[in-house]
């Protein structure tokens, strides 16, 4: 093995160890072949060097002791969580590379769109993420991948990418035609473009925002609309940037619109936006599991969101996890066996001893995590 500066890396070399950013974000796992794209991404993330496999006696030393490592790995495999198994899969490795490619493209669109005479091409934008949704037809498959990407990348760009993908999934459930699916996907991808006008120290502040800082954040929908308003793109994309924080009951921002004045795509993107935010880790809380998010939506979502859109979303999310193994808040594991249509966050579960518990009638119990 040998250490090379990023500028001396060449396509075809193999990473001997994971490639990580100065902030600890994984760019590529060990064993990845360096491509020109990956090397450029390393420069973008200010990764100064990498350890690569190379000629020499140390390579022999590295390969001379595979058996003990293999035995440890086999033992560890037995105790891996579902998330860890996903992260170790070839499918996730492919998804990860496609995801970073999409992030790079989206970052370029965001920064370029603030300059004069830049044209956003919706077809190219949607095509930049097409590999991420074409081969993943179920919400569980997609969310498994997105959950593991959070550990690696949790930026405005990754959030917008997630919202674009989730919005498209909702559009599929609503049986939108392909053209509208593409417009909805683009609306999700661009919904937070206005945040590029917000100082990073405010966007990434770990603690509670001051009133002044929160007021600054609340300007991002208007900033986004201002960036997009002169683009020759579908008006629904512009409206999604402006209205995705509006709520049906008039409690949203920036204009406190009620449902009849909110664009339908903005309402769909708003649901995807909140779901992605709730399932992300924050300095003040751990990420919420899907059933905790459903419970939050059930608590106040029916009046804040379009009924058709929110019920379609919640029913599909809950149904996707039927028969999954989950952990309750008291630490016990069980399997979801039947959904409660009037309380989707409180399904019936079967314990390991065969006992069936209706969480809707056992109000002290709730699903804490999906495994």
Language-model features: locations:
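Alpha-helical scaffolding flanking metal-ion-dependent phosphate/phosphodiester catalytic sites
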Residues: 163, 183-197, 215-310, 319-321, ...
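Short secondary-structure boundary/hinge segments and terminal tails
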Residues: 59-61, 189, 206, 246
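Short, contiguous strand/loop micro-motifs
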Residues: 24-27, 154, 211-212, 252
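Acidic/His-rich, divalent-metal-binding segments that scaffold phosphate/diphosphate chemistry
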Residues: 74-215, 228-231
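Terminal helices and disordered tails flanking the catalytic cores of nucleotide-processing hydrolases
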Residues: 1-116, 287-371
